[in-house]
Curated annotation (Swiss-Prot):
This is GTP cyclohydrolase 1. SUPFAM superfamilies: Tetrahydrobiopterin biosynthesis enzymes-like. GO terms for biological process: compound eye pigmentation; cuticle pigmentation; embryonic pattern specification; larval chitin-based cuticle development; preblastoderm mitotic cell cycle; pteridine biosynthetic process; regulation of epithelial cell migration, open tracheal system; tetrahydrobiopterin biosynthetic process. Toroid-shaped homodecamer, composed of two pentamers of five dimers. Its EC number is 3.5.4.16.
Length: 324
């Protein structure tokens, strides 16, 4: 299945299901180039190559008397990791499935969701609505302007006085600009800027400026975003990382969800061995109101793939992000 078809023909839930974190870890680090060698990391702890997995699968198949390899149904297995890391679910495929071309991890038959016992309070990638897009938003401008006019009247102001007579329309246009990310899709922003490249070391772009709107109080929060990923023979144009930040920050947001959405979008774009995102934000809802803590900052992170499973890879990324 081609990358273009993935984005244009699959629904948001299908795209996000495909990278649920049961499918992301080390044993599914697959090459999308001309060979199937596993992508290298700063540490090989807990990883296995594609050839090893295929050999193990063949051995399991021949253990069943009289059963050819191709007839053995795929079965999930828990792979123990080094140290105190938790086991991860590895989905084995036999390559004969019509929807499996060997270039992409297979989606779990029953992906975990917030309704799965024990995960009621969790947010999974398929819950993030990356492709949410409302109806034509420019058509909402008159209604939005009328709402702002009512708001001014509710404050005891005269919306017809000279300084405010055009304020409702200006405020409505400003709000449309602040949330213009709803009008953008990942496919449009990437615009084909995904390139074959035999580069298997970490790529980090840090201190990307970000502005967003808190969905709780409709006041701004702003800060910086740092993104790192470990390529699997695919790299992304560097400016596209900043544009991905722009898509999701220009929406009504909470910082935690914004961080996840950026990480999932990079994963969809280049299917890397792992993605790491750190966001540092200043929230005006904490500065202008409430506790009024002017110097407070909020830091959130999302680690996927090797960045989540390999402490050395994660440490390397954090050192690069924190270096001056």
């Amino acid at each position: 299945m081609s990358f273009t078809r993935q984005l244009s023909e699959m629904s948001a839930s299908e795209l996000n299901d495909a990278i649920d974190d049961t499918n992301f870890p080390q044993a599914h680090i697959l090459s999308r180039g001309r060979n199937n060698s596993v992508c290298s990391t700063s540490s090989t702890s807990g990883t296995s190559s594609l050839a090893d997995r295929q050999q193990n699968q063949a051995e399991e198949a021949t253990a069943i008397a009289g059963t050819p390899v191709e007839e053995v149904a795929p079965a999930p297995a828990l792979v123990p990791l080094a140290g105190n890391q938790r086991p991860r679910l590895i989905l084995k495929t036999n390559g004969s499935s019509p929807d499996s071309d060997g270039t992409q991890p297979k989606t779990p038959l029953t992906p975990r969701t917030s309704t799965t016992p024990g995960h009621e309070k969790c947010t999974f990638h398929h819950d993030l609505e990356l492709d949410h897009k409302p109806p034509t938003r420019e058509a909402l401008l008159p209604d939005m302007a009328r709402s702002y006019r009512l708001l001014l009247g509710g404050l005891g102001e005269n919306p017809d006085r000279q300084g405010l007579i055009k304020t409702p329309e200006r405020a409505a246009k400003a709000m449309l600009y602040f949330t213009k990310g709803y009008d953008q899709s990942l496919e449009d922003v990437l615009n084909g800027a995904v390139f074959d490249e035999d580069h298997d070391e970490m790529v980090v772009v840090k201190d990307i400026e970000m502005f967003s709107m808190c969905e709780h109080h409709l006041v701004p929060f702003y800060g910086k975003v740092s993104i790192g990923y470990l390529p699997c023979n695919k790299i992304l144009g560097l400016s596209k990382l900043a544009r991905i930040v722009e898509i999701f920050s220009r929406r009504l947001q909470v910082q935690e969800r914004l961080t996840k959405q950026i990480a999932v979008a990079v994963t969809q774009a280049v299917q890397p061995a792992g993605v790491a995102v750190v966001v540092e934000g200043v929230h005006m809802c904490m500065v202008m109101r409430g506790v009024q803590k002017i110097n407070s900052k909020t830091v959130t992170s999302t680690m996927l793939g090797v960045f989540r499973d390999d402490p050395k890879t994660r440490e390397e990324f954090l050192n690069l992000v924190n270096s001056k």
